[in-house]
């Protein structure tokens, strides 16, 4: 984010604080079918998750040729592969012979992929390199039996992919800059492409995939849900939001920001006095905190179940005990607050079938959560 834009955001925040105001939008309702209807859920998978890029891991997780991540994304098993020469590839994790998965979920080191069923063998570029009794398959030429590619790319410190097969004539290399829009320039400015993951987490979440984002697109809950963790750092129910299509950039001013009134604008740095949230639709969340960032992606597994992949990104791996403890404390602070949010989402999901509610409500300062749902509705034809 260029300095002139940082200054404009700080001026905007100071004006809201001075006027004891917050940015507001239209109140909205959210029908419970959004969280419980399996037919609607499949429309979300088809029209959203299989059409939009997702950040699936930091680039540094696949640092060397032969580094592989196997991960299930919206019902599609993927292989994200650092190939020879450093090229990033994405494939469906399924043998072209009889469909068996080549690798179990997780991070791997590999020189090739060997199917455990009949030993069909693929290179890191996805090409079929060998198969026993190859003469038995005149109807399946080796050149036509490479792994099925998916759109994928590496950009701005993350590995991105869309969980669907590349269509005929489609370039398998994603244009991530076009997808990120104007907020992509912020990520370039922060320099995430050289940062490394200090800690990574993966966990099951017994809630619809949308619930975690609702809680992270508003601050109305901070003084109550986070009263023992981060609430003291922030103003009550105050955020600033900008949008580019379905993407959000949300700024959460910290109480320390008022100290900037005593400094010349040339000395202002927004990252030191505010948290900056980037939500890249549909499911990638980046929290920039000045000297580090926290990122997570929520992947749906069923209408009432999802899985979270997250990491704390830092400029370089620490080598001293003091530095290790510093980054550990920052990561624990983030995940401690986030665990509070996720627990509340799980609690809400557990009441959906009780008959207590037919709709849920978003107030005027929860308008970013309402916009998120409006974008989902637009894309699935709701």
Enumerate the predicted regions with their spans:
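N-terminal short leaders/motifs
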Residues: 10-38, 100-114, 148, 228-262
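C-terminal catalytic domain of Rieske-type non-heme iron oxygenases
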Residues: 5, 153, 158-382
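Short, solvent-exposed coil/turn linker segments
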Residues: 31-33, 57-58, 140-141, 175, ...
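Rieske [2Fe-2S] iron-sulfur-binding domain
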Residues: 61-178
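Short, flexible segments with low predicted structural confidence
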Residues: 12-20, 124, 182-185, 269-270
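Short linear motifs in intrinsically disordered
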Residues: 56-64, 141, 273-278, 311
């Amino acid at each position: 984010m260029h300095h002139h834009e940082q200054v404009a955001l700080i001026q905007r925040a100071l004006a809201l604080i001075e006027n004891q105001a917050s940015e507001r939008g239209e109140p909205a309702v959210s029908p419970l079918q959004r969280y419980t209807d399996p037919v609607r859920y499949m429309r979300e998978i088809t029209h959203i998750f299989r059409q939009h890029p997702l950040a699936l891991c930091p680039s540094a997780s696949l640092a060397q040729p032969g580094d592989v991540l196997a991960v299930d994304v919206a019902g599609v098993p993927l292989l994200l592969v650092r190939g020879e020469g450093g090229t990033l590839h994405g494939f469906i994790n399924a043998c072209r012979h009889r469909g068996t998965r080549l690798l179990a979920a997780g991070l791997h080191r590999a020189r090739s992929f060997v199917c455990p069923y009949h030993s069909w063998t693929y290179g890191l570029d996805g090409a079929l390199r060998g198969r026993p009794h190859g003469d038995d398959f005149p109807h399946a030429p080796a050149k036509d039996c490479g792994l099925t590619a998916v759109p994928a790319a590496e950009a701005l410190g993350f590995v991105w992919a869309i969980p669907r097969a590349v269509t005929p004539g489609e370039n398998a290399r994603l244009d991530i800059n076009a997808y990120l829009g104007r907020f992509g320039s912020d990520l370039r400015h922060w320099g995430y492409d050289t940062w490394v993951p200090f800690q990574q987490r993966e966990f099951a979440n017994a809630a619809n995939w949308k619930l975690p984002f609702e809680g992270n697109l508003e601050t109305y809950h901070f003084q109550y849900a986070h009263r023992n963790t981060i609430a003291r750092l922030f103003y009550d129910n105050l955020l600033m939001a900008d949008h580019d299509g379905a993407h959000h950039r949300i700024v959460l001013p910290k109480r320390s920001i008022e100290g900037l009134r005593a400094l010349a604008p040339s000395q202002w740095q927004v990252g030191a006095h505010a948290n900056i949230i980037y939500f890249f639709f549909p499911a990638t969340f980046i929290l920039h905190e000045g000297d580090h960032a926290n990122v997570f992606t929520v992947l749906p597994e069923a209408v009432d179940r999802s899985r979270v992949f997250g990491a704390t990104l830092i400029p370089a791996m620490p080598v001293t005990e003091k530095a290790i403890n510093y980054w550990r404390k920052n990561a624990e602070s983030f995940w401690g607050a986030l665990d509070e949010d996720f627990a509340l989402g799980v609690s809400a999901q557990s009441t959906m079938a009780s008959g207590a509610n037919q709709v849920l409500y978003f107030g005027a300062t929860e308008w970013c959560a309402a916009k998120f749902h409006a974008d989902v509705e637009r894309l699935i034809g709701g």
